[in-house]
Structure formats: structure tokens, C-alpha cells
Amino acid sequence: MASTKAPGPGEKHHSIDAQLRQLVPGKVSEDDKLIEYDALLVDRFLNILQDLHGPSLREFVQECYEVSADYEGKGDTTKLGELGAKLTGLAPADAILVASSILHMLNLANLAEEVQIAHRRRNSKLKKGGFADEGSATTESDIEETLKRLVSEVGKSPEEVFEALKNQTVDLVFTAHPTQSARRSLLQKNARIRNCLTQLNAKDITDDDKQELDEALQREIQAAFRTDEIRRAQPTPQAEMRYGMSYIHETVWKGVPKFLRRVDTALKNIGINERLPYNVSLIRFSSWMGGDRDGNPRVTPEVTRDVCLLARMMAANLYIDQIEELMFELSMWRCNDELRVRAEELHSSSGSKVTKYYIEFWKQIPPNEPYRVILGHVRDKLYNTRERARHLLASGVSEISAESSFTSIEEFLEPLELCYKSLCDCGDKAIADGSLLDLLRQVFTFGLSLVKLDIRQESERHTDVIDAITTHLGIGSYREWPEDKRQEWLLSELRGKRPLLPPDLPQTDEIADVIGAFHVLAELPPDSFGPYIISMATAPSDVLAVELLQRECGVRQPLPVVPLFERLADLQSAPASVERLFSVDWYMDRIKGKQQVMVGYSDSGKDAGRLSAAWQLYRAQEEMAQVAKRYGVKLTLFHGRGGTVGRGGGPTHLAILSQPPDTINGSIRVTVQGEVIEFCFGEEHLCFQTLQRFTAATLEHGMHPPVSPKPEWRKLMDEMAVVATEEYRSVVVKEARFVEYFRSATPETEYGRMNIGSRPAKRRPGGGITTLRAIPWIFSWTQTRFHLPVWLGVGAAFKFAIDKDVRNFQVLKEMYNEWPFFRVTLDLLEMVFAKGDPGIAGLYDELLVAEELKPFGKQLRDKYVETQQLLLQIAGHKDILEGDPFLKQGLVLRNPYITTLNVFQAYTLKRIRDPNFKVTPQPPLSKEFADENKPAGLVKLNPASEYPPGLEDTLILTMKGIAAGMQNTG
């Protein structure tokens, strides 16, 4: 390790690595290679930058880093002005290049951190229970350790653990929430950089390997840098679906059977000598991509139909490959009588069939290879399944009949189960438990649709349709009826037989869209879909309306209807709403003892602040679980968590283990949103860790529940939540000019230019904070590193508790030390403070906010500091993140990059918003764009921008860079 003394005033750093070593603390552990990894990547990049654009640009980028590092080390805000002066006079092409360079270096720092974490995992020196970011978390829930701990420490028998696992289901729901700001092209290049770096540090590497890997590393770094980071068009829902499904194809498909084998091994190690049955739904996958129409007019019935058919095509393709591998493997001739008879029937009925479109096994298979005969027939039906879906996708019709393809999972499983049983009967169970078992598990996990598509729609849209029907029938306006009358009418129609939807119903485009979606549900195979989720649900009639519309549109197997409670008031009334629903006899007959309820973390946090939302979510879950228990209903809670703490994010296993006791009971659904998909499933080892975390934490929560809060803790939380909500709303809702301040002090108005999702940023045009979606709301505050929605109200709540009774300070410390929910809430808040910087937020205020609003910004920054100090006192910490040196080290490494981008963003916003802002032009830096009279190619990438050349792209690059540095977007 280099000396840690500060550089002298005349000392010039020739490598960023030299400056890094002034900043970064010493090794955190013996296997700490973060600085080494980062220096290697950044030095390679700087050499590439110099080769492409000359030494002036390289030197400028290094100087920006050094000024930012000075600010980070000393907190001297004059350095921000110095940096701003350097950045504002850049020529348009140079500005884009500098922003792109810093963004790229930040991405490389993230990759170094990911490789370091994987290195520590391999060395089994993982720090347990840390609070690092989700994707690169050093946090863990190891399935084998969990099983052993449940037996040896908790006192459960191995059989009890086995039974619990057999009855457990974790359903991970991929959503297209627009928070993945990086393009897929760059994500793939980053993956190759990560792999090169990992292999370069392997112990058995030869000199030739090292040279070739080093060349590959430089090639990939340069390819990433030369790729446009900016999406030039908004993605369609179909494109989002393809993006999400690429993870299923690339890591999850093979990852699931690999993980389930590890579960088998873990069970064996606690004395269970049988495998987890293949028909156990330990892990399931669902999707909202192409089904979530809430506030997204681009998700039409046609889009929903397209993504379902596309998913069936993808699934059939994957299965065809697996079946062909299995045909090579199952070359045995011994089989039981049942399989022999089936094989002979299939062989005689196929004639001397030649299928030239197959590469392998294209001629008729002889009867002395019975398993291959059976599997060949399965492959034929899969081929037809794929081609039928392709035809329906292309033209809406297909000559291939449904009968000649697979239409149900049972039909697909039957011949595979026949092969499995036959192998076992003939003494070949070891062979049966190989690739065939893996395939059976894949079929049971993914079905014929790969993922089940959830449908989500806002309750008001259903009200519009029912209102149009009742008005057309001349029985009044459904919209104006009270809840009792709505329920009475809906139930009478549901109990009756008469058709309700008249063919001549006058329909607006919106009504036609809702009805069209139900017709798609009726048209496509039922196994394509998950539940039907109603956002902004408030009453039983919201659920019954969807039940009625499903019946009217001919949905053969109605989707389970799931109310989503997300605003604070809706969460408070959720238990009563669920109880009213369960008191309806017709509905209880319909659900057969099972109900799913979704709770939303994003809108509740935007509505009331993080502390109040977290506590209300906790209480709502507890109370709904009690209601379900009284009515004999198995309740599954669906957690709509985002990636950021402001939207319910945080390390997976900690989030699960801090849920109230008796609310999971072996069954949980969780959204995996935006950038979190890449963090959780971008690599095979990440996929494995993700499946392990969810499975182990869900099992542990059920078999070793967290403590219930003491009555005095509850009372104090109730009181603090009221104070926190009042404080939060006094600023966000009641402060007359808050919206003006928010839009001035953050890049909220420019957010839509990033093209990071198909969904509009607002539910309705115009309006204030209430119409703004939670993602751009959180995104904007994350960009300025102020994170206001996460901490606002918390300090006031703590202060109230301590001022009311000084003994409450000890109660709060006790809550932190003994209650997982409270500890996780505060530790995640501490992580946010570690990433925050009121000095940076102050720069945005200074440059962008009206003079008369600046005192308001100063008040907020004072509250930020006060809240942070109170938090540290309650947690018993002297410094931020003193208990997590790994995350602290990573932040020290990333922050100078982020600060440069923050300053660049603030000054770019100033130039965009204030045409009178004067800048002093600098001579060109890049040798590529030295001719000032020739427009640079970089600037021409965005010819439609309404701003002066280069400003919009520079702004977008800073947004992407800060999102990468925070390791969250929205």
C-alpha cells in the first residue's frame, strides 16, 4: 500500500491510482483486492482515452477527479465552484466526452467492486449481515447454513425443515419499471469486462493466458466506451419484455436446476436422504412486462397478446434444446412395460418419418431406443407449439392445430414422468436423477409460458366500463352509487346467468382497451397468466367488478384478483377492506381458501415518507394476516418493492427477515424491478445467490420468526409515525412553493429525456407531486444526493419521542438492538445518508433555485444533518457505516466520480434553464474534434435537441453516471 500522506502542492499525479491511494482506507480484509482491481481497469481506460483523444483530454479528466477527491476529503465547497468553472467552458463534443469518460470510469469502479465481492464469496470470508447495495451486497443467506442452523440452533427436526421447504413458494416478478438506465449493449460488454478481470486474477493463469486476457480486457473497455450510452428512442413494452426474458434465457434457465441440486445437497447434509420433489414450486417466475397497463397507454391488448405468444415461442425453443440433449443421454433399451407399449405405438404410427428440419435424430428412431422414441414425439409437439405461436404472432391464425401442440403443463409432463418412472423401475434411478430430473424441474418452474404474465390496471378504469354498461342499460350511473349498492348489483349479476355486455355498448378508446384486455385473457391459454392486480383499490366492489368483467368476456379460468394497497390511507383501511371482501359468501366460494394481496412501497413512501410508510406496511400486513386467519384463508402477500430504499429496496434477506411474524408462512411474491434485475440475475453466480437468499430467508422467517414488537415499542412507533407524516406533508404537500422548489433544485423536469422506460413519468399530465410517479420522484432526489423522501420526517419523529420523555432515547436504542424491523429500517437509512451529501444538494440550490427559496433549501439541509446525528446516536455509531467497512470503502472509491458528475449536471442544468448564464469557452481538448468549424460526430447523434449543441447529451450522461454511482435510479 502506498503512503497515505497528502500530496504536496506542486506534486502532479500521473495516474488516478496515485490519487486513489491517498483517499481509500487501508485493506479492509486480507482478501481485499478492490483498489488493485479498480486501478487495473481505470489505468487501461485512461490509456485508451489518450490513444483515441490525446493527452489533453486524459489530463483534464484526471484533474476533475482530483478536484472532486479534494472536496470529498476536506468538504471544501469552494472546490465545487472550481470544478464547475473547469467544466462549463468545454466545447460541446468535449463536454460529452468528459461526461462519458467519468461515467465509464464509474462503471469500471462498480465492476471492480462486483469482482471483489465475488472474490470474497469464493474465499468464504463474507461479512454476515452487512448493508451493502442489493446487487453487490456482501449480505448472505446461505441455504446450507440456514438448514443446519434451523436444526442445530432452533431445534427443528430435519423432517420438519424438509416439509417446510416442500410447502414453500417464492414467486419473483420481473417488472419493466423504468429504472434500468444502462443499455443492454453496455450491460453485456460490462459482463465480459467482469469475466476478463476475474480470469486475470485466477491462481493457475499462464503468461500466454494473461496476455490474451489483457488484450480482451482492453478491447471490451474500448468497445464499451465507443458505444453510445444514450437510448435514442423510448423502448416499447415488447422491447422491455425481450430485455427481461433475456435474463431467463441467459442465467435463470440453467440456474434454477443448479440451485435446486444445491438444495438437495443441503438436505442430504442434515440427514434427509431424498431429493426435493420436482413438482415442488420452490421458485416461480412471473412478469409485468406487457401486462402492466396502469398509467401506461402503450400497453394495449395487442401488446399483451404479443408478449404472451413470444414467451411461449421462447419457452418451446429452450425445451427443444433440452429434449435433444436428453435424447443423446437416454440411449438405454431397458424400460418398463408401460413405456415400451407407448414407444411401440408411437413408432408404428409415425411410419418412416423423416424430419429434415432437425439437425439431430432427423430419421425415424428405432423401437429398441424407447426413451428416444418418446422424447422424439415430445420434440415434435414442442416444434408445433413453437410454430403455432409464431404463426399466431405473425398473422393471428395458424394451420397447426392446438391438439398437435402442447396446451397444458400436465400434457407436457406426462411423457417425461413416464420416462422417469421407467428408469427408476429398471434400477436406473441415478440416470433419472440427472438431466431428466433437471428438465422436470424446469417444466414445473417455467411451464409452457416461461413466466406467468400478471395483468395490472387502475380501479377507476374498471369503474368506467361498468358505469358505461349501467348507463347504457338505463339503470343509473354505477360511478355515483354508494359502495353497498355497487356490491349488491355486482353480486346479483355474478350469481345470475344473463349476459350483461351489450354488443352495441358505446365505447371510448379507454373502455375498448379495458374490454380488449379481458378478451385477450379469454383467447390465450390460461397458463399464460398470473393474477389480475387492481391498483388504487379501496373497496370490495373494485375486486367484484373485475370478477364480473372476466365472466362477461368469456375468461374460462378466471384470474385470481389481487387488490393493491399503496397509499397511506389505503394501507390503513386495507385490513377492513379485506375483511369486507371475505364476508361476501360468493367471493369466499370463488377463492377456495386462497387470497393474494399486494402492498406497495413506492406510493406509500411518496405519500407519507419512508418511516411512516414502513410502519404502516408492517401493521397492515400483521392485521391482514390476522383477518385471513379468522376466515380460514391462506394469505400470500405480494411486495411491490423498488430498488431504492425510498421505494422499499434493500438487501433481500434482511427485508424478508424483518417482516412481521406469521405474514409469510412459506409463500411470498416480490417484484424485481429495473436495475435490480441486472444486479440479481446478470451473471450465473448472481442468479444462484439471489435464489439462495430468497429461499433461505423465507424458510427462516417461517421456522424461526422475528420477535414481535413489545407494546411500548408499538405505542412509540404509532406516535412517531404520526409526527413523521405531519412533518413530511407539512413540507411536501402544505408548503406553498415546494413543487416550484423541487422542480428547480432537481432534474425532475428533464427526467423524461432519458428514455429509460415505456411508461410516462406521470399518471396524468399537469398537477403536482401527487400525479408524479414514485420513480421520477425518488430518481430526482437521488440525482442530487439529497434523498429527501427517505429521511424527511424521521428526525422530527425521533426528536418528538426524546422530548416527550428522555427515557424514550433508551427505548429507541432497545428497539434498534432487539427488533429486526426497526434495525433494518434505521440501517437502510444510514446507508442512504452514507450516499448522501447536503453540500452537493446546496450547489444545486445555489445555481438553480430562486433567491427567495434558498432559505427554504437551507432549512431542509439543516434537518438532514440533524436527522443523521440523531440516527447515529440511536444506533450507537460514531461514524456513518462504521459497521460496514466494505461498503464504506466502495463509496470512498466511487464518490469523486459522482461528485464530478453532480457538478457537471448542476452547471449543465443552469445553462439549459438560464440563457443569460455566461461561460468562458475553452480550446478543444480532444484531438479528434480539434477543428472548431467542423461539427463533431458526437453532437450529431442528437440532432433534434431543443437545447444548444451537446447540452442534452451531457445532461443525460450525468444522470446515468449518478444512477450508476448510487447503484440505484428510482
Swiss-Prot record:
Q: Where is it located? A: Cytoplasm
A single GO cellular-component term from the record reads:
cytosol
Q: What is its EC number?
A: 4.1.1.31
What keywords sit in the KW lines? Allosteric enzyme, Carbon dioxide fixation, Cytoplasm, Lyase, Magnesium, Phosphoprotein, Photosynthesis
- Function comment: Through the carboxylation of phosphoenolpyruvate (PEP) it forms oxaloacetate, a four-carbon dicarboxylic acid source for the tricarboxylic acid cycle.
PANTHER family assigned: PHOSPHOENOLPYRUVATE CARBOXYLASE, PHOSPHOENOLPYRUVATE CARBOXYLASE 1
HAMAP family given in the database record: PEPcase_type1
What is the protein name stated in its UniProt record? Answer: Phosphoenolpyruvate carboxylase 1
